[in-house]
Amino acid sequence: MWRERLDGPTALDVAHLNAALGRQLASHELVLALLDPRGHLFQRLEYVGDALLDIAVLRALVLTEPWDEPSLSFVSDEQQALVSDHALGRVAARRGLPDVRAFDASRHRLADRIEAAIGAAWADAGVDAAEQVADRLVVAPGLPHLPRAGAVPDSAPDMRYEDAARLCGHDVRAPGWFGAAAAGGPRRRRLAVVGDAVLEAACSTSQYVDDPLATEAQMSEERRGAMSNAAIAGRAHELGLVPRKEDADDCRSVADEVQALVGAATFDGGFAAGLGVSAAVLGCTYAPGPVDVLA
């Protein structure tokens, strides 16, 4: 067991890392990547963790306001405040992550390290573990006094959205989420902003698994194409999510339908459920983790 061979500063650093994350990472490679935050594996973990952190932050922020609140400015502003390099750099210090010994790490690199830690939790133990680390490091400390509404929106059921969710492999639990997506207006927009982040995370986790050699830059470029409004709108047509003929050619509007569907599934069944629906929408590998670290 690699832990038994640790001594001196490295043993202390690993102990600090465990305490900060609230868990032990089983993989030595993941631990080394977080202690010396540079190189191919670190970049790939940061890429995935960035996307997963966005889900955790946006989901929490959306729940702090009424579903009929028309403006998303609070959500947008608070998201930027929570995930900025400055904010995440402070998180690294306050949560007790060990110092970087190999080089003088910039604030940007320290912020990347928080995101990589979330990606490492996903690779090591799955998306639920990543959510827990994101909440422990960023969401709970950053939003300590904000209310969490959490209730299912009071919306009439909508079989169009429920059928689309089932077609994507999701077992609907609370129909109100899908009724809210169908209702349009602020409710749909709030679900869609979360759904957009989940779609991005589904693409990111799939890329990590499918292409072990791809760099962060290569994956980012590929993801932009997969996440285009035109590509997502095409799937909306296939899923029967274009309610009005006059909207059929409006890719932005049609893509919102799919994003709202994914957001509804995420609130209904959790992160893994949202990733599953997203993978079905995008036609990509469903990768809730854990995964081969070096994949």
Protein language model regions, located:
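Double-stranded RNA-binding/processing signature
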Residues: 1-295
